[in-house]
């Protein structure tokens, strides 16, 4: 069964899918080992691993390459950010083909102008509703398998208001999207209203310190959200821990005791035993042939 088909099964279960954000194969593997049903490739995290802010500076090729590394490191479905689709509806068509080809289960496409910026920043700009819907229709037409999910993200709440966000979400669902993603609702009343007023499954972006009020995952599920992504969960933790470790070493001149040893057990978590078995098997074949 494809990961896209597995993702469809998760959606059909009516249990909210919680997908922490992965920025690379390492964090994807950790999410998998922690037992989550899906992972989410964050565009912000991908940008930051390349040394850039979330300002739309990363190309489609770079995003697909990172998604490929994560897909190859996990055993569960990957939802991926695909920003604006990297151009107009023709670019979106190719974007869908590329993400689907490497085994991603679902992508979200947004209605910001290109280049975009993080959905929880100010001064965003939107394309027209007509241009947005053209992209969604192109995305739905481009996929080879109907299991591959198109998530329609709208950033219109911050630019033209909540009502336009609801209208764009419903229009996207009516034109081929499978899931709606109203980015950055600004009050708890708006958070609760989205799954009530949108005519299809809804995704909630859980961003600490962003425009949306903090919410417990159980409350999001009670409100009716189908998916909750946590893009900054590991990214924020990595930055905080790295800053602290670097400060400790600079101050004390030695590694703190909390640092895990390498290689040993750490490599084992990333498949060392499997690769050892393969090498032994290949060499055993040579020995048998020589005899």
Task: Label each residue range with its predicted role.
Residues 249-291:
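Flexible C-terminal active-site loop/helix
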Residues 2-233, 237, 244-247, 282-291:
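Alpha/beta enzyme core
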């Amino acid at each position: 069964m494809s990961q896209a088909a597995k993702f469809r099964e998760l959606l059909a279960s009516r249990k909210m899918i919680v997908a922490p954000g992965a920025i690379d194969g390492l964090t994807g593997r950790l999410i998998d080992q922690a037992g989550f049903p899906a992972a989410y490739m964050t565009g912000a995290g991908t940008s930051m691993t390349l040394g850039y802010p979330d300002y739309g500076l990363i190309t489609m090729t770079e995003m697909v390459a990172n998604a490929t590394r994560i897909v190859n490191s996990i055993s569960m479905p990957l939802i991926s950010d695909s920003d604006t689709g990297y151009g107009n509806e023709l670019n979106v068509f190719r974007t869908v083909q590329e993400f689907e080809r490497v085994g991603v289960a679902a992508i979200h496409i947004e209605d910001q102008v290109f280049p975009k910026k993080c959905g929880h920043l100010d001064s965003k700009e939107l394309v027209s509703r007509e241009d947005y819907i053209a992209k969604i229709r192109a995305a739905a037409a481009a996929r080879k398998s109907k299991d591959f999910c198109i998530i329609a993200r709208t950033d219109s709440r911050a630019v033209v208001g909540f009502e336009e966000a609801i209208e764009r979400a419903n229009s996207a669902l009516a034109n081929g999207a499978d899931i709606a993603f109203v980015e950055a609702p600004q009050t708890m009343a708006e958070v609760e209203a989205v799954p009530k007023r949108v005519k299809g499954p809804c995704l909630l972006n859980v961003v600490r310190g962003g425009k949306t009020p903090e919410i417990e995952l159980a409350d999001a599920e009670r409100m009716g959200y189908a998916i909750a992504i946590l893009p900054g969960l590991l990214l924020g933790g990595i930055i905080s821990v790295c800053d602290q470790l670097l400060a400790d070493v600079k101050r004390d001149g030695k590694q703190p005791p909390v640092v895990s040893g390498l290689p040993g057990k750490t490599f084992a978590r990333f498949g060392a035993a499997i690769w050892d078995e393969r090498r032994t098997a290949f060499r055993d074949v040579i020995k048998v042939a020589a005899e």
